[in-house]
Amino acid sequence: MYVEREIKKTFDKIITSYSMVAVVGARQAGKTTFLKQQMSQGKNIYILFDDPDVRGLFDEDLKKFEQQYLEGNDLAVLDEVQSCKDAGRKLKYLVDSGRRLWITSSSEVILAKEILSYLVGRISILRLYPFSYEEFLTAKGQKKMTAPVALRMMWEHMQYGGYPKVVLTDDPELKETILQDLYETMLLKDVARTFSIDDIDSLEKFARYLAVGPSGILSYDTVSNALGISFRTIKKYLDAMEKSYFIIRVYPYFSNKRKEIVKQPKVYFIDTGLRNIIAKTRNKEPDGMLFENYVCTELLKCGILAKYWRTKTKTEVDFIVEKSSGVVPLEVKLHAEPGKIERGLRSFIEMYHPKNALVVTYKGTHGQMKVNGCTVSFTDVAGMQQQLIEMNNVEPQLRPEYIKKIKKIQQSGNYTEFSSIKQLRDEIENKKKRPS
């Protein structure tokens, strides 16, 4: 079963302007399946660079590689080409020679300066993550649901994650087996091998610490004392895991450096199913840490890289979404009562005076309240992104075409098409510049 991905509309626009497009993301997130579905009628070829013969030919004789694989084809999909010798220069040559190339990558090696420096202006990069909640519901054939069914669906998505193979498997034990295999492959191949990490035992302990350790801001001192590893090793592990789409680091939002912590990140897993298999948890309901991780990944999948806010007095807001209309503080709660907000959210509102704030709850508490002129909306995960888009409707500097486009998106229900008004403006302005 093929599930249409939310990046398709963006992808369709990009391929009209770029001869080279890279789709990057975690292993088994669906990159290859997505690109194969987009390959139109005609002469196309899919080339897997895990094959040592293919890799060797590309490394040693580019002309012969071109003749053997690319001649006569309108499009070539190059799977994991980025780790080949001198990949950036060779890809530049192929594109400048008129080749149309799509690339997949399971790590951000493709974004390394020694590769990307050759491809500036020639390549567009899209990120594909495991299924979002909306994609998950599509895969499950769920359209109109009662509240209990919707909650059960969300818990399944949170418990086992969004990797397509896991989602499309019904047996819970098989789901866990697939996740365990995926974890081991990602850790050994994508993290350890790609980034030259030899101490696998130490890396595994670090991954488990992130999954089960204390929530909140990552303290290098605490990790170092708990695991007996140096700050340098911690940083190397974090860099490798993030570049392999294993974790994501969320950094602080600040304006007053003297009052707020400005360096230490929070760490979340790209997929909550992966986190749970590492932590070996079998809960029947989410805890606060898991739900917070889930909200972070859902924001990420719709193009929003949030920040967090915390002062030295430990006043905190879980996520801060920066939008062109201003910042939106976002508090994550398993349960919330409309009319009551946490001290941290109230402090942020008093300090920064945002127009809007969100309290995202697991069981879908709904309602609104006013705090110092700020509209605080209580919603669930499914309504979170819609709320973020709708907040921009009141932006005073919006020109009519932006408002018209937003309304069209709202009517279609496809709220993942644009994650910010800036993205919307860029899309419209680029369209104006294209020759008719």
Cite the ranges covered by each PLM segment.
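Accessory nucleic acid-recognition modules appended to NTPase machines
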Residues: 172-327
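Hydrophobic anchor at the beta1->P-loop junction of P-loop NTPases
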Residues: 23
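Small, basic N-terminal interaction modules of short regulatory proteins
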Residues: 384-436
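Conserved lysine of the Walker
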Residues: 31-32
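Domain-level recognition of nuclease-like catalytic cores that cleave nucleotide substrates
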Residues: 365-390
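Interdomain motor-coupling "hinge/lid" segment immediately C-terminal to the ATP-binding subdomain
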Residues: 106-108, 113-219
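Short glycine-rich substrate-engagement loop in P-loop NTPases that contacts/grips substrate
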Residues: 45-75
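Pre-Walker A adenine-sensing motif
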Residues: 1-15
